[in-house]
Amino acid sequence: MSVEVSNESGFDVSEVELVSVARFVIIKMDVNPAAELSMVLLDTAAMADLHMRWMDLPGPTDVMSFPMDEFEPGGRPDAAEPGPSMLGDIVLCPEFAAQQAAAEGHSLGHELALLTIHGVLHLLGYDHGEPDEEKEMFALQGRLLEEWVAEQVRAYQHDRQNEKDCRLLYKSGYFGYL
């Protein structure tokens, strides 16, 4: 699986986290592991231009998705067997996302993870134009975000425990006997 990130926004964001959450969603949604995804981070002026050009809406937005191939997403009950493909592009605007994060009382990292999930789901065919679609998509993106955060916490705790174990083994002189 290939996830490429191009940060043209001038904002300092964790590209590692963006790749991590995108990969997590792709795996959870049962997309072929050979799938490719491109992510671009833009400043507000560039995002406003893109928003006007593609959606005919003024001003910047937080996330836009541009599917490359038309296919049924994996992970849905009615989906065909997923195959390798270029999923498409997700365009994020960190500056706009930072404003949303502040308004919601959470971190920029949290907001960008949520927007990445939202963007991937759009690439997989999910939409929120109708109330039922919105309910399904937003519930799924909330669940995926919770699961990704829980996985990150477990990985962090595992790493801290490994560090403690290694320090203890070095202090005990255990490694001197190997």
From Swiss-Prot:
Cofactor note from UniProt?
A: Binds 1 zinc ion.
Q: Which gene encodes it?
A: ybeY
* One BP annotation, GO: rRNA processing
Major place of localization? cytoplasm
Family the entry assigns: Belongs to the endoribonuclease YbeY family.
GO cellular component term of the entry, any: cytoplasm
Q: Which NCBIfam families match?
A: rRNA maturation RNase YbeY
Highest taxon above the source species: Bacteria
Q: What is this protein called?
A: Endoribonuclease YbeY
EC number(s) recorded for this UniProt protein? 3.1.-.-
